[in-house]
């Protein structure tokens, strides 16, 4: 079965749309994307998708919708996935490049928050960096 995919119309998708040259040429996507201010709509969509046979529930973007993820974790028995989208990644990378944040600490906190909110699966552009950091922290003698 397909995964339930809960996402909202909002600004976090801009970097991906720009990179993929997939910004709408006309009109907008509001007619089929949920209102980002309405968490209950996202939950209704999750429950509807489960009734239709979803095997996994995916919430994206991750950081802005931790409340939806947490609520789903308390009410849904399916595995919960969260997608740390390109906009979230770009914000971290830009701030780190400017020396405003410690990238490793921010990424670790962000992904930990997603796990704490109930994600069993985390999809992120930070995966390779996080794997490297985890391997370094598990190196004997350090």
What are these regions (language model features)?
Residues 54-55, 118-119, 127:
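A structural motif
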Residues 2-7:
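Short, small-residue-biased leader/transition segments that mark boundaries at the very start
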Residues 11-12, 61-77, 129-135:
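Active-site-adjacent beta->alpha loops and helix N-cap segments on the catalytic face
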């Amino acid at each position: 079965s397909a995964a339930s995919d809960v996402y909202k119309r909002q600004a976090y998708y801009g970097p991906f749309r720009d990179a993929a040259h997939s910004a709408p040429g006309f009109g907008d996507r509001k007619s089929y994307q949920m209102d980002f201010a309405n968490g209950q709509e996202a939950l209704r969509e999750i429950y509807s998708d489960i009734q239709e046979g979803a095997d996994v529930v995916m919430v994206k973007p991750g950081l802005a919708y931790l409340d939806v993820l947490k609520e789903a974790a308390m009410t849904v028995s399916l595995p919960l996935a969260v997608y740390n989208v390109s906009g979230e990644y770009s914000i971290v990378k830009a701030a780190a490049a400017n020396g405003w944040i410690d990238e490793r600490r921010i990424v670790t906190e962000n992904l930990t928050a997603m796990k704490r909110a109930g994600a069993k699966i985390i999809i992120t552009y930070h995966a390779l960096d996080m794997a490297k950091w985890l391997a370094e922290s598990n190196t004997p003698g350090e």
